[in-house]
Amino acid sequence: MLWVTAGQSTPIRLLNMQTGRASRTALRVAIRRAAHQAIDRPRILEDPIAVCLIGPGYERDMERAMHFVARDFRLYMSVRSRYAEDRLAQQVAEGVEQYVILGAGLDTFAYRNPFAALRVFEVDFPATQQWKHELLAAAGIAIPNNVTFIALDLEHKSLAESLLEAGLNAAEPAFFGWLGVVPYLTLEAFRSTIATIGRLPAGTAVSFDYAFPPETLSAKRRQVFDTLSKRVAAAGEPLQLFFTPEDLEKELHAAGFSRVEQFDTDCMNKTYFKDRADGLKLSPVRVGMLATAWV
């Protein structure tokens, strides 16, 4: 039971938003993933659920995602999901049978999961999960038996307690997807979360994205950051946590992780956009990076 009791005092904030309010950022991400399915060929991520989940009424928003300025965000949302799912597939091949999606939002993996033995835990705020249930029902998308929802009461339970109560086997490794969450956290919440994951058995891993400190960015990157920062702050979900790659690795190693992969824009383009006839690729003016850490 040490996995539960150590470091329990810090509640986990999956997103910085008002209690009882579904995430507007989660909707924007879902619209961009859906737009990728409708617009880009070949697709970076095959997601037949994305368009039907958000339902009708967002056609104009999907059209905006075609604009040059919005294109990079559209592509990045699909790349980061593909990256995490590629790392998940690697862990499944090594025997991992538990997948925890932290801040799941409108993520669709659980409804197109190709791994019969993989159990999926979706963790998010109660309001966001209720909204997702409504969208799934409206779209006629059944919830598979191997999917468990964890509506985390941030004021009363730790992540570890909630996962154990939901049936996570802490004696076995797990893979964690943590996309679009870290930049919204406090440092204390980030450390508490990676400490919880870091106490799981060897073979456990987590994939996530993070943002660079604004003061370290070039003028062009700072302009991109400022635009994004103002937009999410206006939605009530301000960016507040940043790392240099070196500082991030120190945090992860201190939490018990033995290996860290840093996956920058150049890696993303070489891996997911190589030899495309349409010339699509991510702009080099990105303000963050993808990462995976293994216990």
Where in this protein do the model-derived segments appear?
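Short amphipathic alpha-helix with an adjacent loop that forms part of the alpha/beta core around
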Residues: L159-A170
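Conserved SAM/SAH-binding loop
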Residues: D153-H156
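A short SAM/SAH-binding and catalytic strip from SAM-dependent methyltransferases
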Residues: P173-E188
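Rossmann-like AdoMet/SAM-dependent catalytic core
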Residues: R24, A219-V295
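A short, conserved alpha-helix within the catalytic core of class I
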Residues: S158-A160, Y184-I197
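Conserved beta-strand signature within the Rossmann-like core of class I S-adenosyl-L-methionine
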Residues: L200-P214
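Rossmann-like AdoMet
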Residues: L2-V4, P11-V100, A104-I150, A170
